[in-house]
Design a protein with these regions (language model features):
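Conserved pre-ATP/AMP-binding loop-to-beta segment of ANL
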Residues: 5-23, 30, 53-60
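Structural detector for helix-capping/boundary residues
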Residues: 16, 38-39, 59, 65, ...
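Conserved S/T- and glycine-rich ATP-binding loop of Class I adenylate-forming
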Residues: 18, 24-27, 61, 67, ...
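Conserved AMP-binding A3 loop
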Residues: 19-43
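Short beta-strand->loop structural element characteristic of the AMP-binding/adenylate-forming
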Residues: 32-35, 63-64, 85-92, 160
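Conserved AMP-binding/adenylation subdomain of ANL enzymes
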Residues: 42-60, 68-108, 123
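Gly/Ser/Thr-rich phosphate-binding loop
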Residues: 82, 99, 104-113, 121-196, ...
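Conserved ATP-binding/catalytic segment of the ANL
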Residues: 208-272
Length: 272
């Protein structure tokens, strides 16, 4: 039986306090403990449930990703907690059992990573693969070369691909359901020239970063502001290494995502 009152400690908890630590994947160095605040958790859970998956208490989320990583924990379990949806939680992904479980447990939504979708695309096709309750999925790393095949084969209506890092201050989400994109962001970002061979940002004669031409690949930076806070790592030295200072003006600060991106024309622009 639940108490009608919040626990006493909630009076002393703020949105900026640390909720948990999540270790980064280690793609740009050794894994580091990233700090996730209550703010980050609540924003991610709310965004996933309402704007990404668009799920409610009548839905069920198929979740086979580890809960010690942000995708499974924040976008999967977080969406269920925020919306009231139920979850089918599998300890380990199984391509051979996937469709049977989706049908048996009436899963309407799924959280994915790209490799999971590739495995499901590569297994032998069956005539009734699209005959299942799954209609909306959210995750990251869906490759363009399998995107449409996977979507059509399994009868998926909505693929909400997202981009973000456990420690990052900006994220993108394909909220408008535009195929083969990571969508959009409301945060202030910059795509700047980057020398891949020398692994360094290209700066002009004044020491400033240079924006790439429209559609050209470049390094993604996210401006650090009161609204887009870089919460960093438990290691302050590692935190500082990810900050690009004086990029476009004296005193500015930007989070270095370490990822190359390019813009694509989807037929419209959104203003904020």
């Amino acid at each position: 039986e639940l108490s009608e009152e919040n626990p006493a400690q909630t009076n002393d908890t703020t949105i900026g306090e640390t909720a948990l630590y999540i270790y980064t994947s280690g793609t740009t160095g050794l894994p580091k403990a990233a700090i996730l605040s209550n703010r980050r958790y609540l924003i991610a859970a709310d965004m996933s449930s309402k704007a990404g998956l668009n799920c409610n208490a009548n839905d069920r989320i198929y979740l086979c990703l580890p809960l010690y990583h942000a995708t499974g924990l924040l976008l999967g379990a977080g969406a269920a907690f925020a919306s009231g949806a139920s979850m089918f939680v599998r300890r380990k992904f199984s391509a051979s059992n996937f469709l049977r479980e989706v049908r048996e447990y009436n899963c309407t939504h799924m959280i994915y990573i790209g490799e999971l979708c590739r495995y499901l695309t590569n297994i032998p096709a069956q005539a009734d693969d699209a005959s299942n309750p799954l209609h909306s999925i959210m995750g990251n790393g869906m490759r363009p070369d399998i995107w449409m095949d996977f979507k059509n084969r399994y009868g998926i209506n909505r693929v909400c691909e997202f981009y973000g890092a456990s420690e990052g201050n900006v994220s993108f989400a394909n909220l408008m359901n535009k195929d083969m994109t990571v969508g959009m962001t409301s945060a202030e970002v910059a795509v700047v020239e980057y020398d891949v061979d020398n692994d360094e940002i290209v700066r002009d004669q004044n020491g400033r970063c240079q924006l790439v031409a429209e559609g050209e690949p470049g390094l993604l930076l996210g401006k650090i502001t009161p609204d887009t806070v870089f919460e960093g790592y438990t290691d302050s030295e590692a935190t500082e290494k990810k900050v690009i200072r004086d990029a476009f003006a004296d005193g500015d600060a930007w989070f270095n995502t370490g990822d190359l991106m390019r813009t694509v024309d989807v037929g419209f622009n959104l203003g904020y």
